[in-house]
From Swiss-Prot:
Binds to 23S rRNA. Forms part of two intersubunit bridges in the 70S ribosome. This is Large ribosomal subunit protein uL14. GO terms for cellular component: cytosolic large ribosomal subunit. It comes from Cupriavidus metallidurans (strain ATCC 43123 / DSM 2839 / NBRC 102507 / CH34) (Ralstonia metallidurans). The keyword Ribosomal protein applies.
Amino acid sequence: MIQTESRLEVADNTGAREVLCIKVLGGSKRRYASVGDIIKVTVKDAAPRGRVKKGDIYNAVVVRTAKGVRRADGSLVKFDGNAAVLLNNKLEPIGTRIFGPVTRELRTERFMKIVSLAPEVL
């Protein structure tokens, strides 16, 4: 579960290393985001020659959470940490590579590009 002020690692090659959630999108009273949800983030740590700079604000989709995702068959998919992929204003991924596994819950029309770039889909 991701909420405002949560820090996430970045699972793409945009140059950002860590981001801070500043808003969970989807209604004024929405508090938590899970895998597949879109959040507004600011870059807190970035590589020197990356595509993004510290302080930039982007949309991002949550791809991994430590809380986990409950499946219909009762199984629970958890990860060691929280991670997100940065998106542009058209909700397309900014990076060209995805690092680490992503969950099957991202297999919607909006995020098929992320699923196809990911090295492993759980």
